[in-house]
Amino acid sequence: MEKKRFVLVHAVCHGAWSWYKVKTKLEAAGHCVTAVDLAASGINMTIVEEIQTLMDYSKPLLNFMSSLGSDDDKVILVAHSMGGIPAALAADIFSCKISAVVFLAAFMPDTRNPPAYVFEKLIRSIPREEWLDTAFGRYGNPDCPLESALLGPKFMAKKVYQRSPIEDLELAKMLVRVNPLVTNNLAGARSFTGEGYGSVTRIYIISGEDNILPEDYQRWMIRNFPVKEVMEIKDADHMAMFSKPKELCALLLEIADKYA
């Protein structure tokens, strides 16, 4: 298979570290892989209070995309969970540098509504008690507050990592950080463009046993903004890169072969 370039975008409170299994497997298959830490994530030194906009949160990803020259191969952008919104922003700005965007159990914006619409729609429907020990906070202007979260260990065990190896859950407990939530106040009202983000090939990978982004909501997002292809990992929890890494990598290699 021809060498392809993957760029991996992590979930809220996580970091590039969450892709360690997938990165290893894709590189072993001969591909070039970059896993990005978004702002205030992983080893990125930004603190949450410095993040006032979606651009701020997405800056490391945007900087990487900007660094790619015209002679570089187009990338396959793979976004997980809330990372779907920064990935959509990158696709809107750098559509000419992207061969496909893969949404893995990810929030997938459309080109009609504000960027955070798909996140707000789900998040506001979940009763606070279902978040268990997750800690929420507010910062910034009291008249237009920004929101943050730190996923709790009980919540991760029950809702996020319930089918993943216990070692990966323990890793996450050690490494998760407070992150901004991509709400309307952070992302703004301006929707992504049809000429940019809307022009890029999109593929959605459904996690069939996802307890935080339910399958029916994943399918609603696909109906809301149809994609080129829908794939599914039936027994994956929200963290398919941990619970079903082989199956996920097989799909990513298939996508690379078809669309890159």
Swiss-Prot record:
**Disulphide bridges:** none
Under Gene Ontology molecular function, one entry of this record is: methyl indole-3-acetate esterase activity
- Asked whether the keyword Chloroplast is assigned, the reply is no
InterPro entries in UniProt: AB_hydrolase_1, AB_hydrolase_fold, MES/HNL
Give the top-level enzyme category: hydrolase
Instruction: List the Pfam families.
Output: Abhydrolase_6 (PF12697)
Supply the Gene3D superfamilies for this chain.
alpha/beta hydrolase
Q: Where is the active site?
A: 81 (acyl-ester intermediate), 210 (charge relay system), 238 (charge relay system)
Could you confirm whether the keyword Hydrolase appears in this record? yes
Q: What is its EC number?
A: 3.1.1.-
Name the Gene Ontology biological process terms: jasmonic acid metabolic process; salicylic acid metabolic process
Assigned keywords, A-Z: Hydrolase
Relate the protein's function as given in its record: Putative methylesterase.
Family statement:
Belongs to the AB hydrolase superfamily. Methylesterase family.
Name of the molecule in the record: Putative methylesterase 19
Provide the taxonomic classification. Answer: Eukaryota, Viridiplantae, Streptophyta, Embryophyta, Tracheophyta
What gene is behind this protein? MES19
